[in-house]
């Protein structure tokens, strides 16, 4: 994802002042987990689209539960990061 794309995602997730305060690791997680949540919310009957959704889930969701726990621990004292991270479910895999 480009820097511009990442900033657009952050602006949708957090107010501009908050987005500017997020550590890069958290911003990357937000972008990935939002893609994961997008694919989790999709339903399809077309076999080709089902395969595409499954690929999207594997690519974007696998490992995010552990990553979220790790980031919450690492940034426990960082109010802006925790505010964003606390919005995500702890278990989606």
Predicted regions: what they are:
Residues 10-11:
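Short S/T/G/P-rich N-terminal loop/turn motif that feeds into the first structured element of a domain
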Residues 19-27:
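Cleaved targeting-peptide boundary
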Residues 1-7:
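Bacterial N-terminal signal peptides that target proteins for export
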Residues 5, 25-26, 49:
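Single-residue recognition of alpha-helix capping/boundary positions
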Residues 14-16:
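N-terminal signal peptide c-region/cleavage motif recognized by signal peptidases
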Residues 40-93:
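Compact alpha-helical subdomains of small soluble proteins
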